[in-house]
Structure formats: C-alpha cells, structure tokens
C-alpha cells in the first residue's frame, strides 16, 4: 500500500460538517484526517501548521476556500483545495450528511491516494 495522504476537512465552526467528515474517514487506511474551522469561534481553528501538514484540503463551501486563500496566501499557493459544496444544513453524523460527504469527497481522496 502507498503512503497515507493527509486530508484536512474544513467548515466554518468545526462543529458539524468537518468533524463528521473526519469521523467518516478516520479509519480509512488511505488517509490521515483532521478537521478545522475558518471562524475565530471554531472549536478547532485552522492554522498554517494544519495547511503545512495537509496533502489535500476539502472545504465544505466556496467561502471556506476563499477564506483560506485570503488568510494563508503563501501556505495555500501549491496546495490542492477542493470544494465539496455541502451546505450547513446538517447535524453531526446526520445520515444524509455522511452520504453527501462520502459522495463528494471520495473522488478527490481516491485520486490523491492513487498518486501517493
């Protein structure tokens, strides 16, 4: 098996979506995962060290990608940041959210894992 890739999931407050994504992929042998939020009030706020750790960043909405590019221009210059287009309409581990995360994230994770 190739090396594991480091996947960082990002939403606003690191409360429902990105922690759910982290839980969904926690035991996947292809990846190591973290989740962070872009808001100053996030449970775990994103820092430059998180971006340095990541091989792939999966954000829930366009606004998260824009925030990362604005706040961390040097750290994101060559980092793949993909938007999953998952709205903030779900609670932690909501079955529909889990399904959306798997459906949206899997192509990016599979592509990155294949390259690793």
Regions found by a protein language model. Name each.
Residues 1-116:
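Short polar/charged helix/loop
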